[in-house]
Curated annotation (Swiss-Prot):
Keyword annotations from UniProtKB, A to Z: ATP synthesis, Cell inner membrane, Cell membrane, CF(1), Hydrogen ion transport, Ion transport, Membrane, Transport
Family annotation (PANTHER family): ATP SYNTHASE DELTA CHAIN
Record's protein name: ATP synthase subunit delta
GO cellular component terms, A-Z: plasma membrane; proton-transporting ATP synthase complex
Subcellular location: Cell inner membrane
Protein family according to the UniProt entry: Belongs to the ATPase delta chain family.
Membrane topology according to the record: Peripheral membrane protein
SUPFAM superfamilies attached to this UniProt entry: N-terminal domain of the delta subunit of the F1F0-ATP synthase (SSF47928)
Annotated function: F(1)F(0) ATP synthase produces ATP from ADP in the presence of a proton or sodium gradient. F-type ATPases consist of two structural domains, F(1) containing the extramembraneous catalytic core and F(0) containing the membrane proton channel, linked together by a central stalk and a peripheral stalk. During catalysis, ATP synthesis in the catalytic domain of F(1) is coupled via a rotary mechanism of the central stalk subunits to proton translocation. This protein is part of the stalk that links CF(0) to CF(1). It either transmits conformational changes from CF(0) to CF(1) or is implicated in proton conduction.
């Protein structure tokens, strides 16, 4: 399935979930569930295989995702949503659904979303300092999502909307390599 189609499907599911969560007053609870699920998907190759598998039956995927949701203590709305996604064979769109839902919530709150990649895990103090600096630079609320990417070797890559600042050691070394090739 082309990525554009998956994006459209993910947006539709995210819109439906957002509207249901809004009408039931559980926007934040569902957002918390989705952030937890996002972290679980990032950390567990087994869970990613279950979600992405075209071989597993709807029933097996439904049972697996239901067990995960129950163990994580997700809300009833999130549990029902995940069950519906499994029955409709749409679990493979979960990453897009989560991103779209969280984007809608941030837009509703007037927040900007920042994605930060770091070579090592940032301490809480470093995350607070980074959030403060981003708030000062972009004005207003900035929701920061920090990911660890050891391939960066050092430094940070910060993306807010369409703006990106890459101060990673990996990029600096690539620029140096290109500059050295030009000398000759």
């Amino acid at each position: 399935m082309p990525s554009e189609t998956i994006g459209v499907i993910a947006d539709r599911y995210a819109t439906a979930l957002f509207e249901l969560a809004d009408s039931s007053g559980s926007l934040d609870q569902v957002a918390g569930d989705l952030k937890t699920l996002q972290a679980m998907l990032r950390e567990s190759a087994d869970l990613r295989r279950v979600v992405d598998s075209p071989v597993l039956s709807r029933n097996d995927q439904g049972k697996a995702i239901s067990a995960v949701a129950k163990a994580a203590g997700f809300s009833e709305l999130t549990n029902k949503f995940l069950g519906l996604a499994a029955q409709n064979r749409r679990l493979h769109t979960l990453s897009g659904v989560i991103a779209s839902y969280l984007g809608r919530l941030a837009a509703r709150r007037g927040e900007k979303s920042a994605t930060v990649a770091s070579a090592v895990a940032l301490s809480p103090a470093q995350q607070d300092a980074l959030t403060t600096a981003l708030k000062a630079a972009f004005g207003g609320n900035v929701a920061v999502d920090v990911k660890v990417d050891p391939s960066l070797l050092g430094g940070l890559v910060v993306q807010v909307g369409s703006r990106m600042v890459d101060s990673s050691l990996k990029t600096k070394l690539q620029h140096l390599k290109l500059a050295m090739k030009g000398v000759g």
